[in-house]
From Swiss-Prot:
The modification Phosphoserine is found at S458, S462. One of its GO terms (molecular function) is UFM1 ligase activity. It is found in: Endoplasmic reticulum membrane; Cytoplasm, Cytosol; Nucleus; Chromosome. Its EC number is 2.3.2.-. InterPro entries: Ufl1, Ufl1-like_C, Ufl1_dom, Ufl1_N. This is E3 UFM1-protein ligase 1. Induction: Up-regulated by thapsigargin. Down-regulated in the failing hearts of patients with dilated cardiomyopathy. The modification Omega-N-methylarginine is found at R433. It comes from Homo sapiens. The keyword Nucleotide-binding does not apply. The lineage of its organism: Eukaryota, Metazoa, Chordata, Craniata, Vertebrata.
Length: 794
């Protein structure tokens, strides 16, 4: 019972205390967070969340903990490790680093790590221990060991040299630190080694052989040489090719060089290189600063040799002879060096009599060359008179004399070109007219590309391309003949000099000979008879009339085709028959100017322009329009210009009547048929057959290039029987196939890897050739067999 009352009294006391106690207010966790965020937003409170979000920490506390962690870790800590220890975002760590570095000058940020001076002092002590042990340490090795940048380490260690580190850094190579004992030991080794050297030695070989530190060796060697302790020089600087040359060797070198130059008057660069002088030119310039020298490609010569050559050249010029300087020079000098020396010498004679240099070493005076030319004068007159008696020749103008000096060679015209022109004249007029007469001489010239008429149609399929012979050239003597002649008159001359002199004289001799020929032939042609000129005019009028009527009939045949085909046919007609008739008229006028040629087909656009420049103004206007009409696209315009030109030149053109037209048609057909009978070329067979079938079908002549044959065959589709047209188309396909096969074979050349392909193509070509041979007679029969009796159908 007593216990119960005791419990009651205790509860009453607790109740009384609760009644009189003051009330305590508590905030929830959520309310606390909202209040803190509000204060942070109003910038009344500056705190940072921890990464787990359970705590707030002030920036000052972050800085304090960073300093503590830096101290705990010995003065070097990574900021990533700080972030893990302090448990805040990395950006807050980085923000505080700047404040720490500003406030504490002994702390630095290096590659994301905080480092203080205490750490660097301990690092310097470790480096000093390594240095005293090995005698040298390299910054590169320390970078790998301590994982720090080289520039930072170099700066930090340099500040502690003499204070913590007992050593010094190489001023030329700040990547190595040495001890005084190490430097002294190496200096003694270097001094002893280089004192024993008596010939040029590569420094690099000594470094590898004796294990020297490269930069230290160069520094010590430079110091010893500059102080005079080592007598010698380092050639090539601090490079792999640096060479140490001892003074004793240099003195021996210099003695030999001076002696050789004094005795011979020249120095070879190769000889100096064999003596161990790497840069011979610089050595010579340095050695002979005040001596006048001439530097060549492989040697240098003194003024004595130059004066000797100059005197010989001067004597040759004054006496009007020649001199070869090669015997005057040392045999070791190359021809190239001799030529350079001669060029230098010749500058002194630039204002005196002109000279010519042959074979790089032979100087020939202008008087000697003129004397050589005069040796041929009598021979020229004899040959010119002989030519006058034996052969009729071209009359040569002053322009031709100028041209012959620039055109070294022009090719002789091919035989088929002349045959082509004769064939076209036969097709057009029915008459065979040769150019120049039976005794006309053809003067051959070497090849030169001719610019004129570059737009001529090329019709390889029909072999009817319109080309002309090259302009001939009168030649006096060939080079070997000139050489033989000179050998008889020039004694003791080198063969190479004779050959080059002959080559040099060819052009002036030919030019002089042309003048002699012209003067001789002019005197023999001044009495040309008027009867001969009348005969020439009559022949010209007949040929012009024939070609004029041909053009009219060809124009009529072109009108059966579409516009694009007509354009191609018109262009071909202008470049061929129209050009022929134009050249006939121009050549007729050129005869009065002494500019005529044997074959008018050889006249190019440039020659026509030259002839125009010599004509009177009245004739020039009409002929210029005729010349320009060849480049137009209208036959009517050409005919109009031709009428005006014929009237201006007093050439009477006979227009053909119906009877004359029938004769021309018959002669043209007969000429084509005769050519078809004898030819075996499939492309030409197809071309001639197509043109003849066209004439049979339309009673009109056609002058077409090979590339228009497909259009002619297409036109004949409705004009000839279907089986004949099918045969013609089949033959056309075989011809095209053969041409393509030939083109591929030409393009491939001779390659061993193409043997199988070549064999296959050869089989195809053989089959095509056989089929063409079988069909050729059938194709010819289309116009020959069935038309034999149709002689008078026109």
């Amino acid at each position: 019972m007593a216990d119960a009352w005791e419990e009651i009294r205790r509860l009453a006391a607790d109740f009384q205390r609760a009644q009189f106690a003051e009330a305590t207010q508590r905030l929830s966790e959520r309310n606390c967070i909202e209040i803190v965020n509000k204060l942070i937003a109003q910038k009344q409170l500056e705190v940072v969340h921890t990464l787990d979000g359970k705590e707030y920490i002030t920036p000052a506390q972050i800085s304090k903990e960073m300093r503590d962690e830096l101290h705990v870790r010995g003065g070097r800590v990574n900021i990533v490790d700080l972030q893990q220890v302090i448990n805040v975002d990395l950006i807050h760590i980085e923000n505080r680093i700047g404040d720490i570095i500003k406030s504490e000058k002994h702390v630095q940020l290096v590659l994301g790590q905080l480092i203080d001076e205490n750490y660097l002092d301990r690092l310097a002590e470790e480096v000093n221990d390594k240095l005293q042990e090995s005698g040298q340490v390299t910054i590169s090795e320390l970078c790998k060991t301590y994982d720090l940048p080289g520039n930072f380490l170099t700066q930090a260690l340099t500040q502690r040299l003499g204070r913590i580190i007992s050593g010094h850094i190489d001023l030329d190579n700040r990547g190595v630190i040495f001890t005084e004992a190490f430097v002294a030991r190496h200096k003694a080794r270097i001094r002893g080694l280089f004192s024993a050297i008596t010939r040029p030695t590569a420094v690099n070989s000594l470094i590898s052989k004796y294990g020297f530190q490269e930069q230290l060796l160069y520094s010590v060697l430079e110091e010893l040489v500059n102080s005079g302790r080592l007598r010698g020089t380092v050639v090539g600087g601090r490079q792999d090719k640096a060479v140490f040359v001892p003074d004793i060797y240099s003195r021996t070198q210099s003695t030999w060089v001076d002696s050789f130059f004094r005795q011979n008057g020249y120095l070879e660069f190769d000889a100096l290189s064999r003596l161990g002088i790497p840069d011979a030119v610089s050595y010579i310039k340095k050695r002979y600063k005040t001596t006048q020298l001439l530097f060549l490609k492989a040697a240098c010569v003194g003024q004595g040799l130059v004066d000797q050559v100059e005197a010989s050249v001067e004597e040759a010029i004054s006496s009007g002879t020649w001199v070869d300087i090669a015997p005057l020079l040392p045999t070791s000098l190359s021809v190239e060096d001799a030529a350079i020396l001669l060029q230098q010498v010749m500058r002194a004679f630039s204002k005196q009599a002109s000279t010519v240099v042959f074979s790089d070493t032979v100087v020939v005076s202008e008087k000697f060359i003129n004397d050589c030319t005069e040796l041929f004068r009598e021979l020229m007159h004899q040959k010119a008179e002989k030519e006058m008696k034996n052969n009729p020749v071209h009359l040569i103008t002053e322009e031709d004399l100028k041209q012959i000096s620039t055109l070294e060679s022009v090719s002789t015209s091919k035989k088929d070109k002349k045959d082509e022109r004769r064939r076209k004249a036969t097709e057009g007029s029915g008459s065979m007219r040769g150019g120049g007469g039976g005794n006309a001489r053809e003067y051959k010239i070497k090849k030169v590309k001719k610019k004129g008429r570059k737009d001529d149609d090329s019709d390889d399929e029909s072999q009817s391309s319109h080309t002309g012979k090259k302009k001939p050239e009168i030649s006096f003597m060939f080079q070997d003949e000139i050489e033989d002649f000179l050998r008889k008159h020039i004694q003791d001359a080198p063969e190479e000099f004779i050959s080059e002199l002959a080559e040099y004289l060819i052009k002036p001799l030919n030019k002089t000979y042309l003048e002699v020929v012209r003067s001789v032939f002019m005197s023999s042609t001044t009495s040309a008879s008027g009867t001969g000129r009348k005969r020439t005019i009559k022949d010209l009028q007949e040929e012009v009339s024939n070609l004029y009527n041909n053009i009219r009939l060809f124009e009529k045949g072109m009108k059966f085709f579409a516009d694009d085909t007509q354009a191609a046919l018109t262009k071909h007609l202008l470049k061929s028959v129209c050009t022929d008739i134009t050249n006939l008229i121009f050549n007729f006028l050129a005869s009065d100017l002494m500019m005529a040629v044997d074959d008018p087909a050889a006249i190019t656009s440039e020659i026509r322009k030259k002839i125009l420049s010599k004509l009177s103004e009245e004739t020039k206007v009409a002929l210029t329009k005729l010349h320009n009409s060849l480049n137009e696209k209208s036959i009517e315009d050409f005919i109009s210009c031709l009428d005006s030109a014929a009237e201006a030149c007093d050439i009477m053109v006979k227009r053909g009547d119906k009877k004359r037209e029938r004769q021309i048609l018959f002669q043209h057909r007969q000429a084509l048929a005769e050519q078809l009978k004898v030819t075996e070329d499939p492309a030409l067979i197809l071309h001639l057959t197509s043109v003849l079938l066209f004439q049979f079908s339309t009673h009109s002549m056609l002058h077409a290039p090979g590339r228009c044959v497909p259009q002619i065959i297409a036109f004949l589709n409705s004009k000839i029987p279907e089986d004949q047209h099918a045969l013609l188309v089949k033959y056309q396909g075989l011809v095209v196939k053969q041409l393509v096969s030939q083109s591929k074979k030409t393009g491939q050349g001779d390659y061993p890897l193409n043997n199988e392909l070549d064999k296959e193509q050869e089989d195809v070509a053989s089959t095509t050739r056989k089929e063409l041979q079988e069909l050729s007679s059938s194709i010819k029969d289309l116009v020959l067999k069935s038309r034999k009796s149709s002689v008078t159908e026109e």
